[in-house]
Curated annotation (Swiss-Prot):
Coiled coil: none annotated. GO terms for molecular function: ADP binding; ATP binding; proton-transporting ATP synthase activity, rotational mechanism. It is found in: Cell inner membrane. Pfam families: ATP-synt_ab, ATP-synt_ab_C, ATP-synt_ab_N. SUPFAM superfamilies: C-terminal domain of alpha and beta subunits of F1 ATP synthase, N-terminal domain of alpha and beta subunits of F1 ATP synthase, P-loop containing nucleoside triphosphate hydrolases. F-type ATPases have 2 components, CF(1) - the catalytic core - and CF(0) - the membrane proton channel. CF(1) has five subunits: alpha(3), beta(3), gamma(1), delta(1), epsilon(1). CF(0) has three main subunits: a(1), b(2) and c(9-12). The alpha and beta chains form an alternating ring which encloses part of the gamma chain. CF(1) is attached to CF(0) by a central stalk formed by the gamma and epsilon chains, while a peripheral stalk is formed by the delta and b chains. It comes from Polaromonas naphthalenivorans (strain CJ2). The lineage of its organism: Bacteria, Pseudomonadati, Pseudomonadota, Betaproteobacteria, Burkholderiales. InterPro entries: ATP_synth_asu-like_sf, ATP_synth_asu_C, ATP_synth_asu_C_sf, ATP_synth_F1_a_nt-bd_dom, ATP_synth_F1_asu, ATPase_a/bsu_AS, ATPase_F1/V1/A1_a/bsu_N, ATPase_F1/V1/A1_a/bsu_N_sf. Belongs to the ATPase alpha/beta chains family. This is ATP synthase subunit alpha 1. It catalyses: ATP + H2O + 4 H(+)(in) = ADP + phosphate + 5 H(+)(out). PANTHER family: ATP SYNTHASE SUBUNIT ALPHA, MITOCHONDRIAL (PTHR48082:SF2).
Length: 517
């Protein structure tokens, strides 16, 4: 048999050319230790800060992910997002090459999700078309637009004294059980029909409390435009820490497309505690109150993402699909104080980051003044420019009346005989205080709130018994709705009052007062 070298070379050549060799390069490491939801990994060379790491799946096949937070010389410290009991020393960990992402878009509206955007309400999967990273840089100064549109909460005391604008960060601060969540939920309920999408982030709360909030939103018909992100007290510290950023990314979807969104963080004190726990377990050096050194940055980078962005930003982001529209993300962070101490570390941090605060007091709450807002130290630094003309013109004297009333009431306890002017001021203050009371889940429209403020401003309530003030108010609302619907519609549409409307409203309130017994 004759061997032909040329033939053999040709055969080898064709075999080499037809070889389909593929190599899969993976960056992987080994678990060195696992404890308290913290995993130390050796051998991950090209891992990014905040990168998602893939761990062995659970027994039922659910993928397990972690977040790379500590990048050290010879190891990586990672927090596990979810269950970690099945992870053992020696397990293989793979880099994903991706920063943590959550699903975004209108598909999430009406759903309850966890910190990773996975549904937990038993209503089936969420088929979101888009996803985005949870950590994003806030819009720059040039991309922003000044806050000049109101975000009505429907609460008389807030909309008149501490108005909130679209794109503002307004802190709600107070001790436990002072009605902080109630104020935020009322603000969400009042956005019905106003084209504002809402995100409610529950951090470290009892599952029963979250369930009650969802039920309240459903009963008010507010779940249709709301996403609830729940990281309950039973979940890991890592999930509680991440949840606020996940919710913010979901809210930014609407802001970046020329829409308005409202996000409530309930509450950031628990997020700071969760972050402190994660940091201490990662052996980062503790600082004041055992919080890590970057706890200010934890909240500032989150709250700076709430902003009003200009038309150019929206146009550039949507590549020209949306033109001539501004977008906004309004944040209502909640902070819980201990015994009214607003000078503690986390409260002072968040007060300095936000554009104002609504301070709720236990003493006022227990006295039946609800919402229990302390008008003296509650401020809105930018909301005044966004207040509607109608409310702005009518609410000018309310804060002054209340401040003077509180001061005089303290002196009046010791004085036996008071002059006429002082007595008048005390009577007026008592009526204004009574008038600012409002039951939960009953937000007011701009026109009805305007009518109430008009009645108290023009002295129509000066001779009404203090105990009957709220009855007078509800009776007036019903009277105006029934007999002066065109006037109320005009006030609602214009958000301002001309001389004709003022004359008509004066006549209407006078007529109602005669019929009020």
């Amino acid at each position: 048999m004759q061997l032909n070298p040329a033939e053999i070379s040709e055969l080898i050549k064709s075999r080499i050319e037809g070889l389909a060799a593929s190599s899969d390069i993976r960056n992987q490491g080994t678990v060195v230790s696992v404890a308290d939801g913290i995993v130390r990994i050796h051998g991950l060379s090209d891992v990014m800060q905040g990168e998602m790491l893939e761990f062995p799946a659970t027994a039922d096949g659910t993928p397990t992910y972690g977040l790379a937070l500590n990048l050290e010389r010879d190891s990586v410290g990672s927090v596990i997002l979810g269950e970690y009991e099945h992870i053992a020393e020696g397990d293989t960990v793979k880099c994903t090459g991706r920063i943590l992402e959550v699903p975004i878009g209108p598909e999430l509206l009406g759903r309850v999700v966890n910190a990773l955007g996975q549904p937990i309400d038993g209503k089936g999967p969420i088929n979101a078309k888009l996803s985005d990273v949870i950590e994003k840089v806030a819009p720059g100064v040039i991309a922003r637009k000044s806050v000049d549109q109101p975000l009505q909460t429907g609460l008389k005391s807030i909309d008149s004294m501490v108005p909130i604008g679209r794109g503002q960060r307004e802190l709600i601060i107070g001790d436990r059980q002072t009605g902080k969540t109630a104020v935020a939920i009322d603000a969400i309920i009042n956005q019905k029909g106003k084209g504002v999408s809402c995100v409610y982030v529950a951090i470290g709360q009892k599952a029963s409390s979250i369930k009650n909030v969802v039920r309240s939103l459903e009963q008010a018909g507010a779940m249709d435009y709301t996403i609830v992100v729940a990281a309950s007290a039973s979940e890991s510290a890592a999930m509680q820490y991440v949840s606020a950023y996940s919710g913010c990314t979901m809210g930014e979807y609407f802001r970046d497309r020329g829409e308005d969104a409202l996000i409530v963080y309930d509450d950031l004190s628990k997020q700071a505690v969760a972050y402190r726990q994660v940091s201490l377990l990662l052996r980062r050096p503790p600082g004041r109150e055992a919080y890590p050194g970057d706890v200010f940055y934890l909240h500032s980078r989150l709250l700076e993402r709430a902003a009003r962005v200009n038309e150019k930003y929206v146009e550039d982001f949507t590549k020209g699909a949306v033109k001539g529209k501004t977008g906004s993300l309004t944040a209502l962070p909640i902070i819980e104080t201990q015994a009214g101490d607003v000078s503690a570390f986390v409260p002072t941090n968040v007060i300095s980051i936000t554009d104002g605060q609504i301070f709720l007091e236990t003493s006022l709450f227990n006295a039946g003044i609800r919402p229990a807002i302390n008008a003296g130290i509650s401020v809105s630094r930018v909301g005044g420019a966004a207040q509607t003309k109608l409310i702005k013109n009518l609410s000018g004297g309310i804060r002054t009346d209340l401040a003077q009333y509180r001061e005089l009431a303290a002196f009046a306890q010791f004085a036996s005989d008071l002059d006429e002017a002082t007595r008048k001021q005390l009577d007026r203050g008592a009526r204004v205080t009574e008038l600012l009371k409002q039951s939960q889940y009953s937000p007011l429209s701009v026109s009805t709130m305007g009518a109430t403020l008009f009645a108290v401003n023009k002295g129509f309530m000066d001779d009404v018994d203090v105990k009957k003030v709220l009855a007078f108010e509800s009776g007036l609302h019903a009277w105006l709705k029934d007999k002066h619907a065109p006037l109320m519609a005009k006030l609602e549409a214009n958000k301002a009052m001309d001389k004709d409307a003022e004359a008509e409203l004066t006549t209407a309130v006078t007529a109602f007062k005669k019929s009020f017994a």
